[in-house]
A protein has these predicted regions:
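Hydrophobic alpha-helical segments
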Residues: 1-195
């Protein structure tokens, strides 16, 4: 059961939230409907989300969602695992990438540059943070400083979301739950407290 009940989707105050998130996920997340209890928190989150997910360099929308999945998988947030894998699919990821991102190191579906970024996301998402020097060096082989800022933006954004949703025990929406069950069989995904 969620710690705090989200605002009802029919509430007029969430009209713009629903519109914004319909593009990314196909629905407005319960996490944002909960944040909306304090509208400035929801507004600040959406502005940060938009800034982080905007593409300026080599990172694509699809790859940013896969980075977010690796970050969320490392943190153990099942709510965010389901959301990020769904968003990656909606942004054009292939079934091979979606079904194997949890094992990216051993997959030919990912380039060496992507593997370096995903390894960085994994290590940067551990608590305590444990990014190896070699990982940082590999990151710089493939990515510019500007790209690394975008990568770190995704990791930091999902650090917030992983903590928010795990502590709040945010209830998963039906479509996100289906995406988790369909696309995350390789990690025996279950919704846990987010059911």
């Amino acid at each position: 059961m969620p710690l705090v009940t989200p605002i009802d989707i029919s509430d007029p105050s969430v009209k713009e939230l629903v519109k914004f998130f319909n593009e990314t996920l196909g629905f407005c997340p319960n996490s944002v409907l909960t944040m909306q209890r304090r509208p400035n928190i929801a507004k600040a989150f959406i502005e940060l989300n938009m800034a982080v997910m905007e593409n300026h360099g080599k990172l694509t929308s699809e790859f940013k969602r896969l980075l977010a999945f690796v970050s969320s998988n490392t943190a153990g947030c099942r709510y965010c695992q389901a959301h990020t894998i769904r968003a990656a699919e909606r942004y054009g990821s292939t079934s091979k990438r979606l079904e194997n991102v949890w094992d990216f190191k051993n997959q030919d579906a990912f380039t060496d540059a992507e593997k370096a970024a995903l390894e960085f996301a994994q290590e940067a998402s551990m608590v305590p943070v444990n990014v190896a020097e070699d990982t940082e060096k590999q990151l710089h082989v493939y990515w510019s400083d500007d790209d690394i800022v975008e990568i770190m933006g995704v990791i930091a954004l999902f650090g917030y979301l992983n903590r928010w949703n795990d502590v709040m025990a945010t209830s998963l929406e039906g479509d996100a739950k289906t995406s988790g069950q369909d696309l995350l069989k390789g990690i025996s995904w279950v919704p846990g407290k987010h059911a």
